[in-house]
Curated annotation (Swiss-Prot):
Gene source species: Homo sapiens (Human)
EC primary class: oxidoreductase
CDD domains xrefs: CYP2W1
Binding sites annotated in the UniProt record for heme: 433
Cofactor: heme
Gene behind the chain: CYP2W1
Name of the protein: Cytochrome P450 2W1
Signal peptide: 1-22
Length: 490
């Protein structure tokens, strides 16, 4: 048996070596420098599993802002630092609008949806989603009113704890429900079984997507399939998809061509009732688009709001300055409105610094849609490219104290809010986050509303410095599960 195993491993290594030698079909390609790959494993031995972004930043110190890394057999180009990322994502060519094939997302979405599709299907889904969100009032008063309604419901939950410790994850209920209200036309009671099930499933999916097993599956799909590493997340995704399909079908009888729509799902159904020769808005892709919106719209904003609260508990001096500004501008009785942002420069600076500091999504890969000139190199069509957002948000040439939580990064000498070109938590270019405007609106109104009403403190016996700001292992850099106290302000 041992001899057979050694023979198998030897053949596997030989196969990997032969594949690596035959991998580059484009003799004209001019690849950036990078570490020499090992057979089969490539450069995986140089990357820390829990901190791949930091490992890639360390490699850039040796090989420069544009370098090549081998993820298994996959030759991938990494962009680090603001200048390299900006040139690639916001340049005139926009050649990096595609996504590379990622094994688990190919199985989940089969080329559909918004975030991991490419080409005509992606363009149609994205353009539709942008129009639908605009028509539903994103960034304007109709959605702002929904957010403030949800703020009241969230405050009711926090009041029930009477200043005692509450789970940090509770803060994610409000952003999730705002997303559901836009998608399905109604908010859910926090005890609604559908709401509870969806939040639980989304949490499990996000943890599984960030697991070592799924990362191994994405690099070696054949090995992952052999070990069934992808099965748990596919089962959970199918449970989410079943709920979404039920919600979508419940709306179908109520949607007629030409009628005003009150939700994203209504708009999807109505679009599918019209001329759709490519089937871009047939049921399967409608569910895929809704799935993408559910997963992205709940996890990212929910995690950011939790981080904001956690960092206020860890930095009581910053929290105090935010509350002093809120009291001075709003007073004790008036809830914040969208138009208050300009009058609250320190609050805005703190929110921006939260997003910079946490680097929620360190890197989501792009792919060259054609042979592409990048940083003096020629990359063949289909090359995966990682714009490393962590390296932008921590770029020492752009930020005075990149490793520290410092709201001053977004303030001038007179205390006025300053927009920073290197602030790219939502990425840039044609693949910029489709929900950026909604996320910004939610975060401002919820964060300002919570700090207007509560002091966010560590639990009794826990010092501010003891609050854990180490990210949990998941698809995003979400905070670890812990508790805070929301003490009503006088």
């Amino acid at each position: 048996m041992a001899l057979l195993l050694l023979l198998f491993l030897g053949l596997l290594g030989l196969w990997g070596l032969l594949c690596a030698c035959a991998q580059d079909p484009s003799p004209a390609a001019r690849w950036p420098p990078g570490p020499r790959p090992l057979p089969l494993v490539g450069n995986l031995h140089l990357l820390r599993l829990s901190q791949q972004d930091r490992s890639l930043m360390e490699l850039s110190e040796r090989y420069g802002p544009v370098f090549t890394v081998h993820l298994g057999r996959q030759k991938t180009v990494v962009l680090t630092g603001f200048e390299a990322v900006k040139e690639a994502l916001a340049g005139p060519g926009q050649e990096l609008a595609d996504r590379p094939p990622i094994a688990i997302f190919q199985l989940i979405q089969r080329g559909g949806g918004i975030f991991f599709s490419s080409g005509a299907r992606w363009r149609a889904a994205r353009q539709f989603t942008v129009r639908a969100l605009h028509s539903l009032g994103v960034g304007r008063e109709p959605v702002a009113d929904k957010i403030l309604q949800e703020l009241k419901c969230l405050s009711g939950q926090l009041d029930g704890y009477r200043g005692r410790p509450f789970p940090l994850a509770l803060l994610g209920w409000a952003p999730s429900n705002i997303t559901f209200a836009l998608l399905f036309g109604r908010r859910f009671d926090y005890r609604d079984p559908v709401f509870v099930s969806l939040l639980g499933l989304i949490d499990e999916v996000m943890v599984l997507l960030g697991s070592p097993g799924l990362q191994l599956f994405n690099v070696y799909p054949w090995l992952g399939a052999l070990l069934q590493l992808h099965r748990p997340v596919l089962r959970k995704i199918e449970e989410v998809r079943a709920i979404l399909r039920t919600l979508l079908e419940a709306r179908r009888p109520h949607v007629c061509p030409g009628d005003p729509v009150c939700s994203y799902v209504d708009a999807l159904i109505q679009q599918g009732q019209g001329d759709d020769p490519e089937g871009l808005f047939a049921e399967a892709n409608a569910v895929a688009c809704t799935l993408d919106m559910v997963m992205a719209g709940t996890e990212t904003t929910s995690a950011t709001l939790q981080w904001a609260a956690l960092l206020m508990g860890r930095h009581p001096d910053v929290q105090g300055r935010v509350q002093e500004e809120l009291d001075r501008v709003l007073g004790p009785g008036r809830t914040p409105r969208l138009e208050d942002q300009q009058a609250l420069p320190y609050t805005s600076a703190v929110l921006h610094e939260v997003q910079r500091f946490i680097t929620l999504l360190p890197h989501v890969p792009r792919c060259t849609a054609a042979d592409t000139q990048l940083g003096g190199f020629l990359l063949p069509k289909g090359t995966p490219v990682i714009p490393l957002l962590t390296s932008v948000l921590l770029d020492e040439t752009q930020w005075q104290t990149p490793g520290q939580f410092n709201p001053g990064h977004f303030l001038d000498a007179n205390g006025h809010f300053v927009k920073r070109e290197a602030f790219l938590p939502f990425s840039a270019g044609r693949r910029v986050c489709v929900g950026e405007r909604l996320a910004r609106t939610e975060l401002f109104l919820l964060f300002a509303g919570l700090l207007q009403r509560y002091r966010l403190l560590p639990p009794p016996g826990v010092s501010p410095a003891s609050l854990d700001t180490t990210p949990a292992r998941a698809f995003t850099m979400r905070p670890r599960a812990q508790a805070l106290c929301a003490v009503p302000r006088p």
